[in-house]
Amino acid sequence: MKMTKTYLLVAIALLFTSTSFAELSIKSDVIYGHKDGMALVYSVLQPENANGAAIVFMVSGGWFSRWSPAQRYASRFDDMLDAGFTVIPVHHGSAPRYRVPEAYADVSRAIRHIKLHAGQHGIDPDRIGVTGGSAGGHLSLMLGMDSDAGINGDRDEVMRNSNDVAAIVAYFPPVDLREITGPNDRFPALDFEPAKAAAISPILHADPTDPPILLIHGDADELVEISNSVDMQAEFEKQHITSEFVTIPGAGHGFRGEDATQAAAMRLDWFKRYLL
């Protein structure tokens, strides 16, 4: 009897899963490059009512980029999909093997690849936003502040494409890696040459050409202190960059419950405002 109930629950779960994704097109594990013989991948989730804009999600926490089935992102980002956005979760070379500079190089390449194949993905290459939290927020900011129009003459077709983005939403991002680079048991991706830290510290790269940026941070964050976003917003204002900074009172690192709902609503509104 117990086994029968288990099978019944599994069957019901599969039924609802199939129903939920019936109007969603999913391309899983699109290869955008290779590293040490391993594929670098992203997935493309496109709703039936696609509006042509895309939101790229940085799959990164502590610069660990753990693979998950693409279908899991359908429920995580159902608000974006319902609004017609194509959602593209990107995986980079993960800690502990790879360091932050390598992770950034990977996601930068991913944006170029997405733009190169924008027609195949049914998106407008000029209406791509990017978002992430913590390490993913850091990578999102770097993509907005360290972009170029493509590397002319590069033998790699992907690298000849731009890596710029049109809007950014970053949750609780570390913005100055000069202060935290070095041996680190918890976050091994930070163990790289200190001389490279400035090149991947968003606080040092803001300029008036940067896209609109929304920062969301909890004032009870003990891992990435809110001063990171305070300082980043001050730099945005100094550079006259279109930006907003929202503090969520009492929220720690990683929004949950009502805090997560509130942050997601603000994120969606930002992308509607600047991508549509």
Cite the ranges covered by each PLM segment.
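Short amphipathic alpha-helix adjacent to the substrate-entry channel of hydrolases
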Residues: 69-88
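Primarily recognizes the serine-hydrolase "nucleophile elbow" in alpha/beta-hydrolase
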Residues: 112-181
